């Protein structure tokens, strides 16, 4: 399964992705995003920790306005 970086405030998303078998990494700083296939951020600050500008190999999913299931589906589609 994929390695997914998730902001700390999105605990429900972290748990759901872990249940699906993904390796979940807490995003505390920009460096935590390196090596992730995909990152999930709140989207409330579009450049949280500089992740929007960093060159990770995966995509960045903004969780704002999405349900946990919708976020998990986007992760599946992008990894």
From Swiss-Prot:
- Fetch the InterPro entries from UniProt: UPF0180
Entry superkingdom: Bacteria
User: What NCBIfam families does the entry give?
Assistant: PRK03094.1
Q: Name the family.
A: Belongs to the UPF0180 family.
Please give the name of this protein: UPF0180 protein BcerKBAB4_1316
């Amino acid at each position: 399964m994929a390695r997914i970086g998730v902001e700390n405030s999105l605990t429900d998303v972290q748990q759901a992705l872990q249940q699906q078998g993904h390796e979940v990494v807490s995003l505390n700083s920009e460096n935590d995003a390196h090596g992730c296939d995909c990152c999930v951020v709140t989207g409330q600050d579009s450049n949280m920790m500089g992740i929007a500008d960093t060159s990770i190999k995966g995509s960045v999913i903004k969780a704002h306005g999405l349900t946990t299931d919708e976020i998990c589906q986007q992760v599946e589609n992008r990894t």
